Amino acid sequence: MPQKPSYLFVSPHLDDAILSCGGLFSYLAPKTDVTIATVFTEAHNSPTSLSIRRFLKNSGYDDSEKLFIERRREDKIINDLIGVKTIHLRFTDGLYRLKSNANRLELALGNILQEAKFIYPLFAWQLKMGKVSSNDGQLINEITRKIEGLVGPKTVLFAPVATGSHLDHKIVRRAIEGRFENVIFWSDFPYNVWDNQFSSDLGSRGYQRWEWNNNLDEKIKLIRMIKTQVSLLFPDGNIPKVPEYYFAKEGVVPFPATVGGLKPLAKEDQYSESQEGDQRL
């Protein structure tokens, strides 16, 4: 009997797979093996920065390690509820990543101003710029090696297309794109809604966009269970109900025929190739 495919969603953060793919994987989970491997699951209390203190205040916490313990616990509870396997890869979140090759001046400055110790000291501004630091080059290779250990011959691999150009999302895409075959990329929600950007640069690379409309009400229920983040992402309590979008190479049907509801978009609806955020990848 042929082996059934398994599905591996590589999520940058502890909420991203649910936000972008919750409709699809909650549909798949009762039918086959689904795993969410979250990359950036760790934080620390010292050193700290203004960006970290602001993030903690907005989250209602005063301790980064306790916040991330709760986020990991929350993630596993939600995944267990729908029958999805949870893997935390234990890399440090971009907000908290420190320079490993700081020069003497940076080390001295770090004793006065702790921000100098961080790869992204002005995190909110650097996030908008979308430029991945060369300090994260080795990190990308380490993530690739971790994913290689999770991918089998029948694994269907999903990754973010990095809509919105979040640095950690771009790092995960770089760790996967071109290093694994037939990867399916997802459009990052809610960045795609905020930026009105439902396309990507992948059209010029032979990818087709697919639309998924099933289980969206279930997905919104799952998002509301992410108590540590939902009020930050949706302060007015309104979670937009929009289709999920996936990008797969033309000629490759992303899922077995038993999966209903997935449809390729017409050619004229496929892409706008001038998406500025994706072109920075």
Tell what function each PLM region has.
Residues 1-131, 148-151, 181, 266:
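Active-site rim/loop-helix segments in enzyme catalytic domains that contact anionic ligands
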Residues 2-4, 29, 81-83, 100-150, ...:
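C-terminal accessory domains and tails appended to enzymatic cores
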Residues 13-15, 75, 157, 168, ...:
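Divalent metal-coordination and catalytic microenvironments
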Residues 17-19, 43-47, 94-103, 165-169, ...:
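Short catalytic/ligand-binding loop motif for oxyanion handling, primarily in non-cytosolic enzymes
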Residues 19, 69-73, 145, 167-170, ...:
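A structural signal for well-ordered alpha-helical segments within the folded catalytic domains
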Residues 37-39, 186-189:
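Generic beta-sheet signal
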Residues 61-65, 162-163, 206-210:
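Active-site rim elements
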Residues 151-163:
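Short N-terminal targeting/anchoring amphipathic segment
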